[in-house]
Amino acid sequence: QIRVFSQSMNVKTATSRHLPRIGGCFACALDGCFGSHDAALNAPYADETGGEGVLYYDDQKVMDFCKEANRAGLQIELHAIGDKAFDQACRAIKAALDDYPREDHRHGIIHDCLPTPEGIEVCRDYHIQMPMQSAFIGWKQEPDDYLERILGHDRLEKLNPIRTFRDNNIVVSFGSDAPCTTPDPIAWMDRAVNNDNAGQAVSVQDALRMCTYNGAWAAFDEQERGSLEAGKIADMAVLSENPYTVPKDKIKDIRVERLYLSGKSYESCRKSILPMMLRGLTSRNKA
């Protein structure tokens, strides 16, 4: 169920541990976030703070890392929220693939909140995937009125362009970014289908695929997971309603009635983990 990314720019560490993936957030974050005004922007923030945010690395550092990781056969993920960081990620991955072309690399850029048209073209042409968080749409911690105040109306309208990525045949998958947003795929579907920016809303079918198959594909797991087919691992959820037939504004009310992992019914543990940990420590001390 878990796929490990070495959240580091140290390629040798990842390869020495036989990890096929590198990147993510933390050490591979190219910028910060809008709320703290350190998401890197191509133009200044619209509020009184001004400034253009922060790029944590210069272009050469990111390009050198991507080239080394790509030549080592690793899958790369980079965090980019602002448009300046998104462009930097696109330049670096493009440079790596120009240096050493790979047919099925599945490199990705995480978040992709404010992409540029030029960056989208690079992602389309170089088959760079988009692991996004549709839960950021209408997110209570950064509501639209706040984002409009710090970014301006024009950039607000360009945030999280899921439909644009989809129309450019760029693979989009949804994740939670927990604990920042809820790890609830039903909520992800709702936000993608009922996007307040109607021009960026996607169909129920597209949203469901972005929550299931595309996520498995993004981790090279589509032969085992992501859809219900003979021979695959039977991870599945039984829902209270059919998302294809309920009114779109009712998708958010759908509940998971049963969960199966590897074909077996799963029941969440309702017991506190603390007593088990204490028993384990006690038994270890006695030994």
Region locations from a protein language model:
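Short, small/polar residue-rich loop motifs at catalytic or cofactor-binding pockets
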Residues: 21, 221, 252-253
